[in-house]
Regions:
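Acidic/His- and Gly-rich active-site-bordering loop/insert found
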Residues: 1-106, 131
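Acidic/histidine-rich catalytic neighborhood of metal-dependent amide-processing enzymes
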Residues: 111-179
């Protein structure tokens, strides 16, 4: 597997079901805490400045920041860390497996695959020459329920452009209604 696929497998193995939904056994999901800690460690290990943005008790957004040549410009890469319930899945939700070249597990498509790709993109930017604009990776909470993570993000962060890692059947979408 590639480094991005390896990262995706790690993320899928972490149960980050939104607390509004049941996880395995019917208890409320644990939320994004373990994914947030893993993302913070990934960024820190690569020397990327990290900011923890508290949103709810025990639930925080994680921001990774690569400075750009023009500090007045900013691009945000946004992906959420929570998933929906694994109820009804016919495979083990937190045991990632590759079949026919595709990695399967809860959150692989929505949206831990996008998060893994963005983490590696930011890591690549961090070791090269400074990009034209500051690049901020925003790993946010609560997209699957009430959008409280991205709502907090936009209260405190202005961006000239944003790339949101939501599945779109591989169609580029240049604008849509929403929070970001």
């Amino acid at each position: 597997m590639t480094a991005v696929a390896d990262t995706l497998a790690v993320l899928v193995a972490i149960d980050s079901v939104n607390p509004a939904y049941p996880t395995l056994g019917g208890a409320p999901g644990p939320g994004e805490g373990a994914v947030a800690a893993w993302v913070e460690q990934f960024l820190g290990d690569r020397g990327i400045r990290t900011v923890i943005q508290p949103v709810l008790p025990g639930r925080s957004n994680v921001l990774g920041i690569v400075p750009g040549r023009d500090p007045a410009r900013r691009v945000v890469l946004e992906a959420h860390m929570d998933t929906v319930s694994p109820a009804g899945m016919t495979i083990a939700p937190f045991a990632p497996r590759v079949e026919a070249g595709r990695l399967h597990g809860r959150g692989a498509c929505d949206v831990k695959g996008g998060l893994a790709a963005m983490l590696h993109a930011l890591a690549d930017l961090a070791v090269g020459p400074p990009p034209p604009a500051e690049v901020v990776l925003a790993a946010v909470i609560d997209e699957e329920h009430a959008f409280r993570g991205v709502s907090r993000l936009v209260e405190h962060l202005r961006a000239d452009r944003a790339v949101v890692a939501e599945p779109t059947d591989l169609r580029i979408v240049t604008a849509t209604k929403g929070v970001l």
